[in-house]
Design a protein with these regions (language model features):
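Conserved alpha/beta-hydrolase
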Residues: 1-5, 61
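Phosphate/oxyanion-binding active-site loops and adjacent basic polyanion-contact surfaces
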Residues: 4-15, 39, 205
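Flexible, glycine-rich phosphate/dinucleotide-binding loops
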Residues: 6, 40, 69, 134, ...
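Helix N-terminus capping/helix-initiation residues
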Residues: 7, 42, 103-106, 160, ...
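C-terminal catalytic-base region of ester-bond hydrolases, centering on the histidine
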Residues: 120-224
Length: 224
C-alpha cells in the first residue's frame, strides 16, 4: 500500500493509515510486515513514527531491503527513478506522493536515520540478503552490478549486502538472485524481455515467501 517513488516519511504515513483502516474486528490481530527494497526503510520509519502501529507488530521481514541505502543513488536523479514505471512487472506507478524516493535512499540519509532512531524493541527483525553469483545477474543489470562492485563486489546490482541488513536482525537467508529476480517477475508476463534483457529472472518466489513466513511463524511461536 505504498508509493514506490515517494519518500520513506510519505510511505510510513501510508502504512500507518492502511493498518489504522483495517476492520475493527481485526484490531487485536498481530502483524508481520514484509518489505522489499525501499519498502523496508518505509516500514522501519513507520514503526518509529507511529508507536501505536509498532505495538501491533510482531515481526518485520526484510527481503533485499534498502536499509542502509544504495551508493547508486549518489549519481541518480528522481527523474531516472520515475522511469521504473515502465519496467514490466515492477508495480512502480506514478502516484500523488512527494516524489522524493531517491533522496530517501542516499546512504548518508539512511545512515543518519539509523543513527538517530532506535527501532522498537518489542518487534523481531529478520533479513534475507540477495547476493547473486555473476552468472545469475540479468543482462540489464550488469552495468549497475559492475558500478556498485567498485564500492563492494558483494552486491545484488542495487544494494551492497551489508546495507540490506536491519541492525540487530536475524539473517535467515542469503539468496543467489539479483535485486529484481527475488521479487519482480518480469519474465513471466514479458517473455521477450525475460529472454533478453532480464534473462536471469527465474526464481521460485512463491516458495521462498512461503518458507520465510513459515520460518518466522515458528520462530515467534517458540518464544510464546
Amino acid at each position: 500500500p505504498v508509493d514506490g517513488l515517494s519518500s520513506t516519511e510519505n510511505n510510513a504515513a501510508m502504512i500507518h493509515d492502511y493498518v489504522s483502516g483495517l476492520p475493527s474486528e481485526e484490531a487485536d490481530r498481530r502483524l508481520i510486515l514484509l518489505g522489499y527494497s525501499k519498502g523496508v526503510p518505509d516500514i522501519l520509519t513507520a514503526l518509529v513514527n507511529y508507536p501505536s502501529l509498532a505495538k501491533r507488530v510482531d515481526a518485520v521481514v526484510s527481503v533485499a531491503g534498502a536499509v542502509g541505502g544504495s551508493p547508486l543513488t549518489e549519481d541518480a536523479t528522481q527523474a531516472k527513478a520515475n522511469m521504473l514505471t515502465v519496467i514490466p512487472g515492477s508495480k512502480c506507478e506514478e502516484e500523488h506522493g512527494d516524489n522524493d524516493a531517491v533522496n530517501s535512499l542516499r546512504p548518508d540519509v539512511r545512515q543518519a536515520w539509523l543513527a538517530q532512531n532506535t527501532l522498537p524493541s518489542n518487534v523481531r527483525y529478520y533479513s534475507a540478503v540477495t547476493f547473486p553469483e555473476p552468472d545469475r545477474v540479468s543482462w540489464a543489470l550488469k552495468n549497475s552490478y559492475l558500478v556498485l562492485g567498485e564500492t563492494d563486489i558483494r552486491n545484488d546490482t542495487q544494494l551492497v549486502i551489508f546495507d540490506q541488513m536491519i541492525p540487530g536482525s536475524r539473517i535467515f537467508a542469503v539468496v543467489n538472485a539479483d535485486h529484481w529476480a527475488i521479487a519482480v517477475p518480469v519474465s513471466r508476463s514479458h517473455s521477450i524481455v525475460g529472454g533478453t534483457l532480464v534473462n536471469r529472472n527465474d526464481y521460485p518466489r512463491e516458495a521462498f515467501v512461503e518458507a520465510l513466513l513459515r520460518y518466522v511463524e515458528e520462530d515467534i511461536s517458540e518464544d510464546h
